[in-house]
Amino acid sequence: MKNNDSKISKYISLILRHKPEEIGLKLDEHGYLGVLDLIEGLNKSYKGFSMDDLERIVREDSKGRYSFNEDKSKIRANQGHSIKVDLGLEAIKPPKVLYHGTGRKYIESILKNGLIKKERQYVHLSKDIETASIVGKRHGDLVILEVDSESMFKDGIKFYLSKNNVWLCDYVKVEYIKEISLL
């Protein structure tokens, strides 16, 4: 990514997940914004921002946060919305276990209340410890939680897999959570 791309990518994430009104726009029911509208809005803060810049940011984003529709006339975040959108995801069977990385400061609450989606549409889970670790390190002293997704699924909990391979569900009860050691 170019020097400013990381900063612009974070701003695009804010717009596409939480605050499209920052640039005077509104997401459609599926979370999409018109690409030309987004570029015009971004040009208020980032003069000269173009379709080439947007395509590069989407292509080079290591987390795969964004996707275009087929003709690249619209763009959306693949998950992480605090705004209600229908991503059109089908419920599917998850792996036997999934993982959630978090900070030590949140463990007491999680072990009391479970994993809750808070301001997001879904709880985010990872298929492997490595990915959960990357996510969890942002929250301070890292703790990895193992989630018994097989039992959750058997108990009727629905799981979804986002386009960028983040596992999503509405809630994880305490009984399905186990703290694991990284030794």
UniProtKB/Swiss-Prot annotation:
EC assignment: 2.7.1.-
GO biological process: tRNA splicing, via endonucleolytic cleavage and ligation
Family matches, as InterPro entries: Ptrans_KptA/Tpt1 (IPR002745), RNA_2'-PTrans_C (IPR042081), RNA_2'-PTrans_KptA (IPR022928), RNA_2'-PTrans_N (IPR042080)
Keywords: NAD, Transferase
SUPFAM superfamilies: ADP-ribosylation (SSF56399)
NAD in keyword set: yes
Paired cysteines (S-S): none
An example Gene Ontology molecular-function term: tRNA 2'-phosphotransferase activity
Function of the molecule: Removes the 2'-phosphate from RNA via an intermediate in which the phosphate is ADP-ribosylated by NAD followed by a presumed transesterification to release the RNA and generate ADP-ribose 1''-2''-cyclic phosphate (APPR>P). May function as an ADP-ribosylase.
Family annotation (NCBIfam families): PRK00819.1-4
Sequence similarity: Belongs to the KptA/TPT1 family.
Protein name: Probable RNA 2'-phosphotransferase
Species the sequence originates in: Clostridium perfringens (strain 13 / Type A)
Classification lineage: Bacteria, Bacillati, Bacillota, Clostridia, Eubacteriales
